Amino acid sequence: MLNVTLLGSGGGMPMPERHLSSLMINYKGRKILVDCGEGTQVAIRKMNAGFKSIDIICITHVHGDHIFGIPGLLSTMGNSQRLDPVTIVGPKGISDVMRGLLLSIKQLPYSIEIIEDPKGKLGITNTEQGLKIKEQKDGMNDEITVSTLELDHSAPCFGYSFYLNRRPKFEPEKAIKNDVPRLIWSKLQKGETIVAGDRKYSPDLVLGEQRRGIKLTYITDTRPTKDIPQWINQSDLFICEGTYGDNDDMDKAIKNKHMTFMEAGELAKKGKVKELLLTHFSPALKEPNFYEHNAKKEFAHTTIGYDGYRKNIEYKN
């Protein structure tokens, strides 16, 4: 299961009722942030979510409304007795930006690891030191697979996909049929390959068909692109920017490389996602719910996001 919390649903500048862009993903008590706009710390405190367990911060792009919360957050995490490294993932330029942001912070009690402009998939595993993310190799033991998509904005910008892998079901009858010793059943269930005597035992000898996991996709600060529908295909939850609610603001959306509610709904429909959650609202958009119909005309299963929105995403049988 994944638990998602929309910490900030605003774009451009903070508002009294709306912090800037940030999403928290909770997996087995450990946390991933996507973007860290101004107000993220305050939002985390409101949610009683805790700072020490944030292991990974994924940045979509380096515009201020998505990164200005980083220095304060990292400092607070240091004050919470965190000692394990924190990994920051982002597009080209993230390393230079982080060097600048870190100048404002006294020495941290933990290290910062940066993954800049990854070209392939990344794998996340849950360890005793928290969530660890690295370049994916075979993906066999990765619990979450992360992929990025280059978007169309005025700065290098990533969309993020998080796929929570689900192990095939253990089939004891299959294990017995294949003469697999009971002593190694549990290891094979975990994806390990075991050599015993003159025989090699692989997980497929005890496991059934591959089962569908959970897919969460996050896209903000972009114009619609031809690659997005396939990339978000069959997402259980598609979180997408809706900077402009009114279709009359299409010229602004094109000029500023953002999207309208209608365009987000069109992408959700083309991508055959299960649910669309809109976020990243313009400061001029005082009542996003007033324009909900513009998205729902294209995609009925649309929710207007708000600071503090929470959702559990569970496996489907």
From Swiss-Prot:
Top-level taxonomic group: Bacteria
Coiled-coil parts of chain: none
Entry cofactors: Zn(2+)
Keyword Glycoprotein: no
Functional description taken from the UniProt entry: Zinc phosphodiesterase, which displays some tRNA 3'-processing endonuclease activity. Probably involved in tRNA maturation, by removing a 3'-trailer from precursor tRNA.
Record-stated family: Belongs to the RNase Z family.
Protein name (database record): Ribonuclease Z
Lineage: Bacteria, Bacillati, Bacillota, Clostridia, Peptostreptococcales
